[in-house]
Amino acid sequence: TEAKVHDSKAMKKFPYEPSAYYIFDRGYNDFKSLYHIHLVKAKFVIRAKNNLKYKAVKWKRRLPENVLSDSTIELTGYYPHKYYPEQFCLVRYWDGQQEREFVFITNAMDISALQVAELYRNRWKVELFFKWLKQHLKIKKFWGTTENAVRIQIYAAMCTYCLVAIVQK
């Protein structure tokens, strides 16, 4: 999307597929869209906003290392609860490398809290890869929207980057 388009607006146009996982950052806390993902039988993991209002209805007592809590919750804010009436999971995770806590919400009730944290960590690796692409390969935006078009543009930029590095030596 263009930089001026808010992430949650772009989220509404995305074609969600059943059984797929969608990993979002805090900018995507749009409970109407998250409920749509849930209804198409897809899964999401999203960083929770600090002001999330909820009520815990169930807790897991035995927690693996770095998992601070793993609970089933319901939203208590009027509109959030109206837009997402189902329960989902809230995971509090301590990242020892960054020395900070992350809070995730997910409708993937069948995976562990550590798997939730790992899914988000992998999303962050993708963010870092795209940051590297922008800095080193000078890709400002993608010309096409299909997977093949994006791959071709990335491969062409990587080849150009390598050729320039060889010539400079």
Regions found by a protein language model. Name each.
Residues 1-169:
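Single, function-defining residue in the core of a domain
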